[in-house]
């Protein structure tokens, strides 16, 4: 297992002034492992309040955060997902605040129970079968190979791939 510190406690960052939900009283932790380009915070420890995640994207990453919000809204008809508490989009930024889903990540389970790899793979496979059982004709999003290859080329051209 990797010994990277997966998140770091941090102070509340400077937020968009339109993020008018009550975020006071939460402790903040910044995610250190994601590679989406977005800044991700876990908000926790506020009495009688749900754990939350705040994702912030700037520039082209703001488009990715916006796309995630749209897909979460659509996918919620098919499976339990985090609740979108707040979303803000400006020309340069996107802020997505969601509830956390209770439980542990596959990484956390594997750290706690190192011999559970086969069970984790089975659980992930079951989830993917459920996701893939959604009829393609119901999906309004384009993610075909032509789109993805053009997106990959653009990312390489813009120096966003660290190969």
What feature does the model see in each segment?
Residues 12, 16, 75-78, 113, ...:
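Short, structured coil/loop segments at alpha-helix boundaries
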Residues 23, 105, 145:
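Solvent-exposed, flexible loop/coil residues
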Residues 18, 22, 109, 155, ...:
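Residues that form generic nucleotide/phosphate-binding pockets
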Residues 126-134, 141-163:
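Active-site catalytic-loop/activation-segment of kinase and kinase-like phosphoryl-transfer enzymes
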